[in-house]
């Protein structure tokens, strides 16, 4: 009975540190909790064989590593061998560069304050409050400025799309003539 209480006390005092160790071993927090629970269950069965309880953390970490390795080996591979390799399209960075160039060009139509808000909120992924603090304005001002800036960007993109379609139509007509 004393061993059970000793193990319970150990788990109670070391649980957070052990969970941090488990989270370093597996990327998903839920899997980390499962890993720790499995390791604790396995360790509980052998608790009395650990003579120096000061080494219990090391023992438990080794159990977690071994358990993770077992899980990794037991996983089902989703790759299925076939006789022919599937055709996979190559990613073309040219389109990405064109999109980025278009976006940089379209941003020029915005006022400097609007451009700053858009860049901080969407590229730097700052929160509304962080953007407000960085620019020295209220959160409400950030929201309204962002709303107006995005509306202006949409208008500009639609206008450019219409211009591009008109140019394509003219080019087709010229080639057909």
UniProtKB/Swiss-Prot annotation:
Family under the similarity heading: Belongs to the sigma-70 factor family. ECF subfamily.
General function of this protein: Sigma factors are initiation factors that promote the attachment of RNA polymerase to specific initiation sites and are then released. This sigma factor is required for normal cell wall integrity; it is recruited by RNA polymerase to transcribe genes with cell wall-related functions. It is also involved in the transcription of the dagA gene coding for an extracellular agar-degrading enzyme.
Main location: cytoplasm
Motif (Polymerase core binding): 34-47
Alphabetical list of SUPFAM superfamilies matching this protein: Sigma2 domain of RNA polymerase sigma factors (SSF88946), Sigma3 and sigma4 domains of RNA polymerase sigma factors (SSF88659)
Organism: Streptomyces coelicolor (strain ATCC BAA-471 / A3(2) / M145)
Gene3D superfamilies: 1.10.1740.10, Winged helix-like DNA-binding domain superfamily/Winged helix DNA-binding domain (1.10.10.10)
CDD domains: Sigma70_r4 (cd06171)
Name of the protein described by the UniProt record: RNA polymerase sigma-E factor
InterPro entries linked: RNA_pol_sigma-70-like, RNA_pol_sigma-70_dom, RNA_pol_sigma-E_actinobac, RNA_pol_sigma70_ECF_CS, RNA_pol_sigma70_r2, RNA_pol_sigma70_r4_t2, RNA_pol_sigma_r2, RNA_pol_sigma_r3/r4-like
PROSITE patterns linked to this entry: SIGMA70_ECF (PS01063)
Subcellular locations according to the entry: Cytoplasm
Gene Ontology annotations for the cellular component aspect, listed alphabetically: cytoplasm
GO biological process: DNA-templated transcription initiation; regulation of DNA-templated transcription; response to stress
Gene name as annotated: sigE
